[in-house]
Regions:
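FNR/FR-type flavoprotein reductase catalytic core
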Residues: 74-218
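A charged, well-structured terminal subsegment
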Residues: 174, 252-259
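Local cysteine-cluster metal-coordination motifs and their immediate loop/turn environment
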Residues: 216-250
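Structural signal for conserved beta-strand scaffold positions within catalytic alpha/beta enzyme cores
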Residues: 10, 57, 161-163, 213-215, ...
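Short, charged beta-turn/beta-strand-edge "cap" motif at the junction between a beta-strand
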Residues: 43-47, 92-97, 235
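Ferredoxin-reductase
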Residues: 2-84
Length: 259
């Protein structure tokens, strides 16, 4: 983990209220594991807490990385107003990402994402492709209007799409998409999305030997000191055992934490 003033190279609104930001700096050299996140200081004196945003793509050759975020409040609204040439105070990479150590060439791997949980799965899919694995994507969005990076994912492997309103792909949610299209027994399952989607994936694959889920949580420090992002551990009858999403996660094995 390091801290750096990174330079903004580009900013693009890829869907309504959803932005892709390209950053450049030496900090990119520390970014190796898909699924980790950056803790970014909002460039406003009245907003003290950093915002955790997952890493979407990494390019070591150009020392650049990309993040994708949705405007949810004052902090992300401030990010959306930044322009190329400006700088951001970035801390990272943080958290435990997806573990690819057991993946072999020709392994079929399921990547399951929903909405704003999709971004970290792009770098994951790209690294799986480099290993020689076969990524298969299952993605859900509210509608076609808020979809993004469709062509980029399709260049990496087979993609199955669902939208709540049926405007693109199957009409329904990701769980319904899995019921219809997830016909193989994959070597691994990786997922990132909201709690409802993760609960569906967890129930379906909790007995799989290599199923990993990236959890979302509100964070303050981002380094495990404040205990503001804890999740309870599955099977703990006392209700006292917990794990920190920012430090021990955000990626946990399926079945480990209560969703």
């Amino acid at each position: 983990m390091k801290q750096e003033m990174m330079t903004i190279l580009a900013q693009e609104e890829v869907a309504p209220r959803i932005f892709k930001l390209t950053l450049q700096g030496k900090l990119v050299g520390e970014m190796q594991t898909p699924g980790q996140f950056l803790h970014i200081k909002v460039p406003r004196a009245d907003l003290l807490l950093r915002r955790p945003i997952s890493i979407n793509a990494i390019d070591q050759a150009t020392e650049t990385c990309q993040i994708i975020y949705r405007i949810e409040g004052d902090g992300t609204k401030a990010f959306s107003e930044l322009t190329p040439g400006m700088q951001l105070d970035v801390l990272g990479p943080l958290g435990n990402g997806f573990d690819l150590s057991k993946i072999k060439s020709n392994d079929v791997v399921y990547l399951i994402g929903g909405g704003i949980g999709v971004p970290p799965l792009y770098e994951l899919s790209r690294q799986l492709k480099e290993i020689g694995a076969i990524p298969v994507h299952f993605f859900g969005f509210a509608s076609q209007s808020v979809m993004y990076d469709k062509e980029l994912f399709e260049a990496l492997g087979v993609c199955h799409w669902a939208t709540d309103d049926g405007s693109f792909g199957m009409k329904g949610h990701v769980g319904m998409l899995l019921d219809q299209e997830a016909t193989e027994i994959p070597a691994a399952v990786f997922a990132c999305g909201n709690k409802g989607m993760l609960r569906t994936v967890d129930e379906r694959y909790r007995n799989h030997p290599n199923a990993q889920l990236s959890h979302e949580a509100r964070m303050a420090c981002g380094m495990g000191a404040c205990y503001g992002c804890v999740c309870h551990v599955t099977g703990d009858e006392t209700g006292t055992k917990s794990v920190k999403v920012c430090d021990e996660g955000p990626v946990f094995p399926a079945g480990k934490v209560v969703i």
